[in-house]
Amino acid sequence: IGFGTSALRGAKNGELFVKEVYENIGIRIHIISGSQEAQLIYRGVRWLFDFKQAATIMDIGGGSTEFIAANARGIVEAQSFDIGVSRLYQNLNKRNNLTANDFKFIKIHIFI
């Protein structure tokens, strides 16, 4: 079993990809929502760390970033944003060093 996250959620051919993988390799992929992704991230972190007080978990991926506010009892709030490292890089369309304008672009996309 596999899980598809932001790249497959946003792909025009995501369902076709899932079908092709299953037919050719035999692996069933489930495309999960950003909310489900945040839940799984929390479970993974919780499995590794037994935090007794409030915690903020951040997962920066290629196509999305999840923020999870949690405490010892569970998730208090979770948000998934379509801002990931690969997505920002593609929007910048750069192969060399970033300029001051590139950093402005990144700030606008992250903070607005």
Model-assigned labels for residue ranges:
Residues 64:
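Active-site-adjacent helix-turn-beta-strand microarchitecture at beta-sheet edges
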Residues 1-57, 68-112:
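Nucleotide/phosphate-binding catalytic cleft detector across ATP-hydrolyzing
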